[in-house]
Amino acid sequence: MKFKVINEKISNLMVDILIIGIYEEVKSLGDVHHTMDQQLGGLIQEMINAEEFKGEEGETLLVHTLGRVPAKKCILLGLGKAEAFKENNLRNVVAKVMREARKSRAETIAITPFGICNHISAEKVGQAIAEGTKLGLYQFNHYKTTAKEQEERVLQEVYILNEETGITAQLQTGIDTGEKLAHATMIARDLVNEPGNVLTPTEMAKRAQSISQKHGLELEILEKEDMERLGMGCFLGVTAGSEEPPKLMVLKYNGGEEGGEILGLVGKGLTFDSGGISIKPGEGMDAMKGDMGGAAAVLGAMEAIGALKPKTNVIAVVGACENMPSGKAYKPGDILTSKGGKTVEILNTDAEGRLVLVDCVSYALQLGATRLVDLATLTGACLIALGTTTTALISNDELWVKQIEDASKNAGEQVWQLPSFPEYKEMIKSEIADLKNIGGKYAGAITAGLFVGEFAEGKPWVHMDIAGTSMSDKEKGYITKGGTGVAVRTLYELAKSMEK
């Protein structure tokens, strides 16, 4: 798929589908659309007058041009209220209309910036259109073998009409950024959607190697023997029951000043989580192939960072393994010793992600990370608390939280900080070890996050629980069913915000 900014009259475009954006409560078309509507015999204005099309956000209506203009078809696209229309609204409506266009098997599409460059920068407009298009059209279907999927026509070209003078370069810059961020997000989506028999820890390491080679990132892959030497008792406890060897991946991007801040990104990579000895119910266990959403987000972020090259330093640490029951598996009642030296009483083997994370956090600090973000599909409690639209944050540093919140706003992703009062830390203290790996049935998302925070060694740290946002069971805007690639763009924006 190619994007191209062009200076052309809307009524002269010879494309399969022309997308015309209309705000809610608009009673008459602007000059650009009015000329074309005249060629269509006033059909669009007539439908607006009859309230057959109201311009509500995401509303679409297909119009056949019947040869009156070069474009074969038009799709009227509702933009909602003008004063409320922001970048994420644009990203979402573009995704929706592109899916509608796909149903018509369109190969060429033209879209206007809808005049919104007046209150959104041209660069952000181009970025949102590119992201909305690519993310909205994303499909994970390469395991399908039927002729229908093989024969489906693919969108080839998207033309963005430049309605104003002097903004072509800004639109193109935004498009280039949006394409790279969308590609990185789709890498994360693919990782989450892959079946567990394909995406083993070994395969994840190969994907990490591909990203590092593409962008010239430093790469280190630690094997089980390396983890034993480093004293990663918590990580090794989780992986003990599996026949698949664990992998710990380290990717380094050096784009900032030598001796400057180093952003540490840590991802939980459980390529399959059965729950171990504390085994999960059979219903829904298939979704546990996606318990590596944190690792997917980190690897996707490193793809974005490698492609867009912000002027900052980043270390990514990804711990990949399986959690399986066997005669060698770790058990409730065991006590494990972490790389950081703290001992952990195991009360439930299905609270394993935090055990992988703490050893990875300790290693990131050993490698020089000065600020930390860990990401994980960690708790069902987070899903209960915040649902499927919002990622939970737990932190030890309010300024660092604010920086991540700002990054998430720039990315169009929702986050919400949960409390971290001292009383919650009391819930994870053990009577026979330093810590226990669950804190009881209350405040589960908070206590799980604070467990990881015990290993941050006082460095600014934020835990992102993406249990509710890593996968979606329906299409909504640029989010498609399956893996969402959540946090990839937020992490890139965070890295960019650290530029000096």
Curated annotation (Swiss-Prot):
Active site feature:
K280, R354
Q: How is the cofactor bound?
A: Binds 2 manganese ions per subunit.
Q: Where does Mn(2+) 2 bind?
A: K268, D273, D291, E352
Question: Per UniProt, where does Mn(2+) 1 bind?
Answer: D273, D350, E352
By its UniProt entry, which PROSITE patterns does this protein fall under? CYTOSOL_AP (PS00631)
Keywords attached to this Swiss-Prot or TrEMBL record, sorted alphabetically, are: Aminopeptidase, Cytoplasm, Hydrolase, Manganese, Metal-binding, Protease
Q: Tell me, what does this protein do in biology?
A: Presumably involved in the processing and regular turnover of intracellular proteins. Catalyzes the removal of unsubstituted N-terminal amino acids from various peptides.
Q: Which PANTHER family does the record associate with it?
A: CYTOSOL AMINOPEPTIDASE, LEUCINE AMINOPEPTIDASE-RELATED
- Indicate the family of this protein: Belongs to the peptidase M17 family.
Q: What is this protein called?
A: Probable cytosol aminopeptidase
The organism encoding this protein is: Alkaliphilus metalliredigens (strain QYMF)
